[in-house]
């Protein structure tokens, strides 16, 4: 079984009720943090997960709303890990991830120096290993396998989606993307597809062109549902709602998805949990 927890279902716009985009995936005793939106560590703490307990951080792309708390994750995983010889935190993402991680560590350089000077058992900077991929297998440990494929979030490029497999169960995390054949292939037959969604019917009515531009490189509810249908997935898990779902309108969003997808449809607030079993 794979357990999916929507840690943050929000967007770049700060929301008092929704953390930034982030999803927790647990499989075979391993814990993966997919994207690091604002507030992610507080949300993770609410389900008993700390930064030092992460098996890996998986980044779909390097937009600010998806990496806003990456620096905090890097530092907190270091200062809260009390192992004598802690294993490096694994960070997996598209090309550009290593540069981003290096820049964040540089930004925290003074803090890192202060802590090394103060604590005898912190004698080196945070141990981190960065792996950059656009396609193929990125993880294969103790029964858990993860592979990636390109998605289409242009002009943001490259971007990737992740497929996590364990004991016959599978979950795909699409990140931000418009429909594309590579995502269809990655998601084919998966137990669940976690997909960001926007309401283009609402967004196109905003007067600001910058807001309307969001429609260029995100999937609408119906487009995400159509991707799920083409791929033959069991469950569509919608997240990263733009605009934020107003309480009482959940059925409206489900109904839009149901016009394209006949399977199980999940959406909810932060900390919404979905179990994915072998198909």
UniProtKB/Swiss-Prot annotation:
The keyword Transferase does not apply. InterPro entries: AtsA-like_MBL-fold, Metallo-B-lactamas, RibonucZ/Hydroxyglut_hydro, RNase_Z/BN. Binds 2 Zn(2+) ions. It is an enzyme of class 3 (hydrolase). GO terms for molecular function: 3'-tRNA processing endoribonuclease activity; metal ion binding. Its cofactor is Zn(2+). Its EC number is 3.1.26.11. SUPFAM superfamilies: Metallo-hydrolase/oxidoreductase (SSF56281). Keywords: Endonuclease, Hydrolase, Metal-binding, Nuclease, tRNA processing, Zinc. It catalyses: Endonucleolytic cleavage of RNA, removing extra 3' nucleotides from tRNA precursor, generating 3' termini of tRNAs. A 3'-hydroxy group is left at the tRNA terminus and a 5'-phosphoryl group is left at the trailer molecule. Zn(2+) 1 binds at residues 61, 63, 153, 176. The keyword Glycoprotein does not apply. Zn(2+) 2 binds at residues 65-66, 176, 240. Belongs to the RNase Z family. Homodimer. Zinc phosphodiesterase, which displays some tRNA 3'-processing endonuclease activity. Probably involved in tRNA maturation, by removing a 3'-trailer from precursor tRNA. This is Ribonuclease Z.
């Amino acid at each position: 079984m794979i357990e999916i927890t929507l840690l943050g279902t929000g967007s770049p716009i700060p929301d008092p009720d929704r953390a930034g985009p982030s999803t927790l995936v647990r499989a075979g005793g391993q814990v993966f943090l997919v994207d690091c939106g604002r507030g992610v560590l507080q949300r993770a703490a609410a389900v008993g997960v700390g930064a030092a307990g992460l098996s890996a951080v998986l980044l779909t792309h390097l937009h600010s709303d998806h990496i806003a708390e990456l620096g905090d994750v890097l530092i907190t995983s270091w200062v809260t890990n009390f192992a004598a010889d802690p294993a490096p935190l694994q960070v997996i993402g598209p090309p550009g991830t290593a540069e981003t991680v290096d820049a964040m560590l540089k930004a925290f350089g003074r803090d890192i120096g202060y802590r090394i000077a103060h604590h005898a058992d912190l004698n080196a900077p945070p141990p981190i290993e960065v792996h950059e991929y656009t396609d193929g297998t990125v993880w294969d440990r103790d029964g858990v396998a993860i592979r990636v494929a390109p998605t289409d979030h242009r002009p943001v490029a490259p971007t990737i989606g992740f497929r996590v497999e364990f004991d016959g169960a599978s979950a795909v995390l699409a990140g931000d993307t418009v429909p594309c054949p590579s995502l269809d292939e990655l998601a084919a037959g998966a137990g669940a597809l976690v997909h960001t969604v926007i309401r283009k019917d609402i967004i196109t009515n905003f007067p600001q062109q910058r807001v309307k531009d969001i429609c260029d490189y995100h999937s609408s509810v119906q487009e995400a549902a159509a991707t799920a249908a083409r791929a033959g997935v069991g469950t569509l898990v919608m997240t990263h709602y733009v605009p934020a779902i107003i309480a009482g309108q959940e059925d409206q969003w489900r109904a839009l998805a149901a016009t394209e997808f006949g399977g199980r449809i999940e959406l909810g607030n932060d900390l919404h949990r979905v179990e994915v079993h072998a198909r």
